[in-house]
Design a protein with these regions (language model features):
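N-terminal Rossmann-like FAD-binding beta1-loop-alpha1 element of flavoenzymes
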Residues: 4-33
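Active-site substrate-recognition segment that forms the wall
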Residues: 20-27, 37, 49-50, 55, ...
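C-terminal catalytic lobe of FAD-dependent flavoproteins
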Residues: 297-371
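Helix-loop-beta segment of a Rossmann-like dinucleotide-binding subdomain
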Residues: 88-102, 114, 121, 126-172, ...
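Short hydrophobic core segments
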Residues: 7-9, 35, 202-215, 346
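Helical element adjacent to the flavin cofactor pocket in flavoenzyme catalytic cores
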Residues: 147-191, 195-198, 207
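Conserved Rossmann-like nucleotide-cofactor binding loop
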Residues: 14, 40, 215
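Dinucleotide-binding Rossmann-like beta1-alpha1 core, especially the glycine-rich loop
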Residues: 50-132, 292
Length: 371
């Protein structure tokens, strides 16, 4: 049996940023435990990493907009503090603007309507001519039907970011419990920790945080989580054909192309709810075809890796973020927005775990809303 002040179940991007936020606020790192059999893996390992509150706008998801905007605004200081804790660390944080392009006339109509919707919500989105766009990104196809630029949408490399967080937390003394979490432990109405491993060893904490994505389904909480699989590709090129994130609509299908600081290019992502646990052939084919239609030179790249991740979806696409009981903080169900919302999720989680009032309006994200 081990006892800590803060026990965080899950060491993906949400758990890692929550632990780092606690350390930033002066919590003794040795009083924090992260419970995860494979830290910095899972959906984090397959994520795109786009910090794109404007481009991620979806119709009828208004409660998400302010959360995404606030979280994106927190990223510069979060990255700066992480790099300060480990000088020389590269987390793949890039601040070039994002281009969103349309492949044909129907896509251009959709892009125009989406841009009007974004403007309605006060988002900074600028229309460009194709000539203007190709003067900055000559790798774009000359056959595109429309382009907009979003100055405030940036990116981080999820693998590098998570690895850096893990290194810093370990160096500072955060305890890693590399075992699978079992049941939560309760004394009356208060959560007092979690069982881990096959021997059901107790890891006790004054506050317990549920940050383990789909794994939260096994903890006995009333969370309506479902796996939404996403196929993603990693390409290699001696010289990247684009220098910023390119998002596109191709016959109404979304695709993104993300050049990384490590020389790779991420292409994604499908969204499917089926039984195929490995990358789907139709998904890989469609991603490559659509990406090459937008940036033709991608056909000269090497295919390094095809991946599939399980994203934790909820019925309304909002995360479960809030108190799940006495001494229990729930922070999961981030679906496609885990990387983007990690900074805000960490701030709210730390606020709640330290018994402070959070300034973030999370009324729509209550963990018990789907009971």
């Amino acid at each position: 049996m081990s006892t800590y002040e803060h026990v965080i179940v899950g060491a993906g991007i949400i758990g890692l940023t929550t632990a780092f936020e606690l350390v930033r606020r002066g919590v003794d790192p040795q009083r924090i435990a992260l419970v995860d059999p494979a830290p910095a893996s899972g959906a984090t390992n397959v994520a795109g990493g786009m910090l794109a509150p404007a481009a991620e706008v979806q119709y009828r998801q208004e409660p998400l907009y302010p959360l995404m905007l606030q979280s994106a605004e927190l990223y510069p200081s979060l990255v700066a503090d992480l790099v300060a804790a480990a000088p020389g660390t590269d987390v793949g944080y890039r601040t070039e603007s994002t281009f969103v392009v349309a492949a044909d006339r129907a896509d251009a109509t959709h892009l125009r309507e989406l841009t009007e919707h974004q403007h309605t919500h006060g988002m900074d989105v600028d229309r460009l001519t194709l000539r203007q766009a190709r003067s900055q990104e000559p790798g774009l196809s000359p056959q595109l039907a429309g382009v907009v630029e979003i100055p405030g949408d940036h990116q981080v490399n999820p693998r590098m970011f998570a690895a850096a967080l893990l290194r810093v937390l370990e160096y500072k003394g955060v305890r890693l419990v590399r075992e699978k979490a079992g049941a939560l432990l309760w004394e009356g109405s208060a959560c007092v920790g979690v069982e881990v491993g096959v021997d059901k060893r107790k890891v006790l904490g004054a506050t317990t945080y549920v940050c383990n994505g789909l794994g939260a389904r096994a903890l006995g909480l009333p969370l309506n989580l479902r796996p939404v699989r996403g196929d993603m590709l990693r390409l290699g090129a001696a010289n990247a054909p684009v220098g910023r994130v390119i998002r596109a609509f191709v016959e109404d299908r979304p695709v993104y192309i993300i050049p990384r600081t490590d020389g790779t290019i991420a292409v994604g992502a499908t969204s499917r709810e089926d039984a195929r646990e490995r990358p789907a052939v139709d998904g890989v084919y469609t991603l490559l075809r659509d990406a090459i239609r937008v940036v033709p030179a991608l056909e000269d790249c090497e295919l390094i890796e095809a991946l599939v991740g399980n994203r934790p979806g909820t019925p309304d696409d909002l995360p479960y973020l809030g108190l799940g009981g006495e001494n229990l903080v729930v922070s999961t169900g981030y679906f496609r927005h885990g990387i983007l919302l990690a900074a805000l999720g960490a701030r709210v989680g730390a606020d709640l775990g330290l018994r402070r009032t959070t300034a973030v309006d999370i009324a729509a994200c209550g963990p018990a809303r789907h009971e």
